[in-house]
Amino acid sequence: MRVLVVSAPLQGHMLPLVPLALAWRDAGHEVLVASGGDALTVDLGGLAAYDVAPGFAFGRIAGRVLLRHPLLARRELAGRAGTAVVGELFGTANATFVDAVVALARRERPDLVVYEPLGVAGGVAAERVGVPGVVQENNLFRAGDLVAAVAASGPMRRHRIGAPAATITVSPPSLTGPRPGLAMRAVPYSGGGEVPDWLRSAGERPRIIVSRSTVAGPGGGDPTAAIIAAAPAVDADIVLVRPPGRLPRLPENVRTVGRVPLDRVLPYATAYLHHGGAGSVLGGLAAGVPQLVVPGPGDRRHNAEAVARRGAGLAVRARAITPEVLNRLVTDASLAEAARAVRDEMAAMPLPSDVVPELTALRR
């Protein structure tokens, strides 16, 4: 069986799809990946990858869309626009590579197309070549809502996206509520990389891992300055992953590191502080560590509020990060207990390898 996996040309959209793609391959199926941009700059486990969006520049697309919709842009930057802006944003993005995905599907003749909710070019391709399409969640919004928003956008309105043969849901029900579909565990995948020896085990003191988004953009605020200012009064070691280029002199309990596979680092951390991307949230939950999520544009406020509502972490604006907040993050037993409960909930969900047989049965 040949499977085509399609994502928007962004690393954070592609990486969550890799574990299922690898499970397909390990089960003896042929897997092709269609994406672009920085999504193809990371280790995809040896999967055959096709660049369907050469020269893709998300920043330029976002700038044009937000300029056309200034009132919605203001709500989007505050994380209050729901799916209104994301539909136009990713509709415009998909329009730049949908023809290439369709051409690839016609040439390679997959038996099934798996696509993420904001990579609906995959759904168009499945419809055009007459094979089942499967939507795989890679964030905390309902997949159907996102697909509908992108499909209804001006740039994608002329393309028909058929109803998916199945929807794979990865959000733990205690976080977002139960959802119809085929449940699957969100298995973190960071795209390879080396882990320094000092991060391969727990330290003598609590450890806070701090990471930044792989997508540059306005809004939300960078918490780095507040973290560095608070650090001397925090009884923990703080690790800044891929920090901004210029930093002041760091306190003794703050270290920096380049890109590391967070799925191999977080299990030894006490807490995780990040920008609120869905991959970061699900990775932190899978590791069972409390999170401090900085609300921001797009889905980041939604994600931060979901984590805080579940009790598995805190939602704190960048400029409101203080020693008291960081000390609570590593000492509040209720946060740690809730984070472990969600970890156990996710661990009980079916693995990607468990859902492959059910998806294989969809072949026409």
Indicate residue ranges for each PLM-predicted region.
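Glycosyltransferase specificity loop/lid
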Residues: 1-123, 129-131, 232, 239, ...
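Donor-nucleotide binding loops and adjacent catalytic segments primarily
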Residues: 22, 185-271, 281
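A nucleotide-sugar donor-handling region in carbohydrate enzymes
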Residues: 34-40, 145, 150-218, 241-246
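Structural signal for conserved beta-strand scaffold positions within catalytic alpha/beta enzyme cores
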Residues: 51, 135, 167-170, 183-185, ...
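Acceptor-binding helix/loop patch of EC 2.4 sugar-transfer enzymes
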Residues: 77-84, 140-154, 306
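Active-site proximal beta-strand in glycosyltransferases
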Residues: 128-142
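A short, gly/pro- and small-residue-rich
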Residues: 132-136, 181-187, 225-226, 289-292
